[in-house]
Amino acid sequence: MAANDVPCCETMFWVYLLVCVALVVFAGLMSGLTLGLMSLSIVELEVMIKAGEPHDRKNAEKILPLVKNQHLLLCTLLIGNALAMEALPIFVDSLLPAWGAILISVTLILAFGEIIPQAVCSRYGLSIGAKLSFLVRLIIIVFFPLSYPISKLLDLLLGKRHSTLLGRAELKSLVYMHGNEAGKGGELTHDETTIISGALDMSQKSAKDAMTPVSQIFSLDINFKLDEKTMGLIASAGHSRIPIYSVNPNVIIGFILVKNLIKVRPEDETSIRDLPIRRMPKVDLNLPLYDILNIFQTGRSHMAAVVGTKNHTNTNTPVHEKSINGSPNKDANVFLSIPALNSSETSHQSPIRYIDSISDEDEEVIGIITLEDVMEELIQEEIYDETDQYVELHKRITINMPMSGNSPETATWASELASPISPYRSSLLSPSIMISTLLRSPINSPYRHSLLLRPTLHASPPAQSPSILSPDSNNERYYYLSPSRVLRKSYEKLSRSNGS
């Protein structure tokens, strides 16, 4: 067609003008939808469907079937955009001179066919794509004979779906960016980002990263007697579970629960051999922490022995250990058979391996791992206990637990004798009373606001009522009061105060 073939203001002129406007609008829709729909990943839409806002969920449900076949959608939109852009100069050339047709067509296509539609659809691509999903389906049907063969060729060359999942490092960076500490408007707190990062890192950590070496654990020989000195060491250690070994600390055969010692009287000097020794699972040195956590979740034990090959482990612990009383062990080469190791797990086959009284020749215990160790790796922070002394294993830095207002170090004691660190206490109180003080719950500790102390573990015979330790204000010595006498004194004091 030559220039000015259609006279101005005639019917065909308006028809051609409407066609040009329609082509510009159609090209703009195709360009905007190409950017808006193709920028939405399948994973992002699935997340919106499961956890998005109600209106976003509806929009994602409409768009997801279209985006699943990405190559077909891409070919359809590009073919429609190309046809509109190629047809527009033909109709504009019928209305304007050549130079005017080039200027107007380039301006219309650039402004209204590319820049504005892509800017709007990049911002509101989800809502616009959902509202125009019916039109997109109609266009796919119209251009299906052209777009389908090209899309199948792209599927063959590039693959049907492109991976949009993030790796672990990318997820950690994404979580950190969503934290409020990053300053980008995220809602995740420091604890949330730390725990999520710890959960992602735990799959790459094994038992050797969280265990406590054998040389640093508190354990007892099975031949030890539970006298006052042993009970004092157990109380000062502050552990709820204590590993038990046979002669050599590397030959761990099980563990005992400290709460089971509440009925043990130190004057009886009960042997550890006579106590119920629980079986301890054994885990490989390179076993992932998640597998260890699954073992702990079974409820059979919250402590496991970490074993390694003797050729790859080197422990400096001597074979002949001295007992608490100072006498060396005589049966250094004898392995003990413990009848108390029987448990409910022996009645059926279990995939969990346990430490036996006789270990494998190529294996030896190199450390202990507990549920607390695994949880510390998960939250990436130390779990402080009210009795332990803390040493960071990897950096060898002593960590002091911050004192609270209720801690014994900051409390006001009724007298110098009431404090467990008093220099007068060791000379006036027997070791049994000292042990009971160490085992006393901090809730019932002898602070000034509480005069009643928790009964000792062994000071009273079974047939007698538990004694209560009370300070004498006159001579600062301790004597025993029965519960009835304490209540009677309190009642008399209350009566005098009411009478006055």
Swiss-Prot record:
Glycosylation sites: N311, N342
Subcellular location per the Swiss-Prot or TrEMBL entry: Membrane
Membrane-topology descriptor: Multi-pass membrane protein
Ranges for domain CBS: 211-275, 276-319, 326-386
InterPro entries recorded: ACDP, CBS_dom_sf, CNNM, Ion_transp-like_CBS
Domain CNNM transmembrane: 9-192
Example of a GO cellular component annotation carried by this entry: membrane
GO biological process: one example: magnesium ion homeostasis
Chief location: membrane
Protein name: DUF21 domain-containing protein At5g52790
The organism of origin for this protein: Arabidopsis thaliana (Mouse-ear cress)
Gene: CBSDUF5
